[in-house]
Amino acid sequence: MESFDKTPYISTIDKKYYESEIGKKVLEFINYHKPDFYTELHCYNLKNYVKLTSMERYKKTGIPPLIKLGNHVLVSSVSPLIRMTYFSTETVCKTLEFPCFEKLNPQIIDEYGFNKDLAIETYEELLNLILSSSSRKHFENEMLKKYKSQVYTAMEYAQKVFGKDFPPY
């Protein structure tokens, strides 16, 4: 994982993140705007792909693995540290993870079969879906059409972390 700015990296699943300057700004933004849709854009080091998508992550941290959307784009809900506290169950909360370009090298690209253009296309497709969705219902219907297996995985993870009746995003 990386920070888009040049501050030291702190994971959003670490309480220290929300005590940092940027974390406090994020919480202020959420409290002020009370969004219906909230999306965090992250990048990750492709060499951590398996670690981020493995159930070992859940066993070690209690946080479900990120879900493979396709073309090395990963998706999940937002940190459980803020999901239940700062948002209603009706808020659509997503974290989108994209490989950090500056961490890519020919060896990593070959090892993981990474295609930058396909990854960008997948990322843009989901961002456009989020931007064009006027309601949770519309978003859910479109996600089921395009990413059915990922939605079922998200539902399973939401139940593990938030309980049986909690939505998958």
Segments and roles (model prediction):
Residues 7-11, 48-50, 105:
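Extracytoplasmic/secreted cell-surface and envelope-processing proteins
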Residues 1-17:
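Active-site rim/loop-helix segments in enzyme catalytic domains that contact anionic ligands
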Residues 1, 9, 38-40, 93-95:
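Conserved beta-strand scaffold positions in the cores of enzyme catalytic domains, especially
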Residues 42-45, 99-101:
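Catalytic metal-binding/acid-base residues of hydrolase active sites
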Residues 18, 23-37, 52-169:
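C-terminal accessory segments enriched in acidic
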